[in-house]
UniProtKB/Swiss-Prot annotation:
Residues 1-61 form the TGS domain. GO terms for molecular function: ATP binding; catalytic activity, acting on a protein; metal ion binding; threonine-tRNA ligase activity; transferase activity; tRNA binding. One of its GO terms (cellular component) is cytoplasm. It catalyses: tRNA(Thr) + L-threonine + ATP = L-threonyl-tRNA(Thr) + AMP + diphosphate + H(+). InterPro entries: aa-tRNA-synt_IIb, aa-tRNA-synth_II, aa-tRNA-synth_II/BPL/LPL, Anticodon-bd, Anticodon-bd_dom_sf, Beta-grasp_dom_sf, TGS, TGS-like. Catalyzes the attachment of threonine to tRNA(Thr) in a two-step reaction: L-threonine is first activated by ATP to form Thr-AMP and then transferred to the acceptor end of tRNA(Thr). Also edits incorrectly charged L-seryl-tRNA(Thr). This is Threonine--tRNA ligase.
Amino acid sequence: MIKITLKDGKVLEVEKGLTVSEIAARISTSLRKKALGAKINGEKAELMDVINEDSTLEILTFEDQEGKDTLRHTASHILAQAVKRLYPEVKLAIGPSIENGFYYDFDAEFSFTPEILEKIEKEMNKIVKENLQLKKFTKSREDAINFMKERNEDYKVELIEDLPEESIISFYEQGDFVDLCAGPHVPSTKEVKAIKLLSVAGAYWRGNENNKMLQRIYGTAFTKKAELEEYLHMLEEAKKRDHRKLGKELGLFDLKEEGPGFPFFYPKGMILRNTLENYWREMHEKAGYGEIRTPIILNEKLWHQSGHWDHYKENMYFTKIDGEDYAIKPMNCPGSILVYKSDLHSYRELPIRLGELGLVHRHEYSGALHGLMRVRNFTQDDAHIFMTKEQITSEILGVIKMIDNFYSLFGFEYFVELSTRPEDSMGSDEDWEAATNGLIKALNEAGLEYKINEGDGAFYGPKIDFHLRDCLGRTWQCGTIQLDFQMPERFDLSYVGADGEKHRPVMAHRVIFGSIERFIGILTEHYAGAFPTWLAPVQVKIMNITDNQVEYCKEIQKVLNENGIRVELDLRNEKIGYKIREAQLQKIPYMLVLGDKEMNEKTIAVRARKQGDLGAMNLTDFVAMVKKEIEEKTNCL
């Protein structure tokens, strides 16, 4: 007998040689039916894997992200098999699972039209019904290369040739189809009960613009048709909320071919942006942060010293000034470090909190650009805290509380991930362990549940990531807290301790917006452009019924302006119904309709974006109501 320790700590004694699937059945029949994969001793595994020794075991279902990934990875193989059945001459590239779905890249001499996608999807459903078993086998590197050459799969050959000579190469077979793959997969194609192809896009082979442009087919898969229908409904709603579409329609922002990845903000968009930035400043001033501004372009030597040159060079832009090499900053931290280092500091001054709304530039491939969500220049709301080791927990707790208050204001729920040391990192094991333990302690004291994201930390330290969940259930990674023992060492930072000696401070990097541009994109979709009154670029629209009320409209506008309310006049010679519809399309919180009756009685007729007609109101009462909404930052979701 062997001992199997489950995720909840329970221990099962079972016979040696059982499969994961058989052990799942011992736990419960319902779990076996829902199981899609597993983790054995923390490593990804499949349901048909055999366990012969004491092990830890986690059964994965569709409720787990790894379970979703396993199912959708198999769906990508089903897609590739369907394409090869219908179009044998097409060459295969890669096909991973991704967030909310999967894709496969193909080299085809024809375009995948909507009609062809429909044909492929029918073939995929046929493959699902065939209940094909997925079987893993391995070959030596040399045999694997020859195997793929015989199949004319040039892209697979290239991938294998890049691996070390001693590599053992794994493949998966399902019926008449074989693909190069490390796995894991579900046992059979029948597990993929609901599948849908979504779109086609261009993608350079291996993400390199110098390589051939392939065709990438995107799809998604679920274990239940009802879940697929719900997801497709969400996608339709997301299209209506697309920030790129709303940004143009509402006159907020745009992206142009003259500056790919470099956003243009229009006057209304700048009002929204400035309102957010001013709130950020207000919040940070209350929390004891000093705001700084550091240069966009800094000498290349600084980036060698910081480590960015070795770990981040491919994402940076460079220029020459007076014959010397300079870099356009991709991050704000070295500048903040120079500000700290410009003076001597005593332990009595710590913690020192410095915040910056800093413009950074990072190179992204053109194919990766997406509205405000993925750009090449953006404003990052960085703050850096310089502190003693004893202050770590209290400072990180303070940041967590600030982030929680900030996201709650906008109606966001969130979940937390702790990302640990990546392969490409700098610093000692001891420093990484101390930094990671410091973050864990703060998370535990804050009472936050979190997931470990192995190997996804920054190159200089572990981090806590905050993932927002919007009103459609989509998640967005925004806030980050990173603990850093490396930068203070590299820049020889110090403070004078109570003993009169120099000591090394600990540094924390943190952002809340992440990128202001991206956060605005997320907010635009979250609210579908109908921003709460305090954020709305235009808070009140005043419209007349006839020319008789023009002067009265201007009087009302003056009073609102004097009370700090953002207002627009619509005095066009149009029907009032048309004006109201247009204001509704512009998603303006309040509309004031002024006719002879309102003018004579010195009242206003109020329409609210959400509640509709509110009837006649006294102007003083209306001003008080709107100002209260603005001051309290009422969320209108």
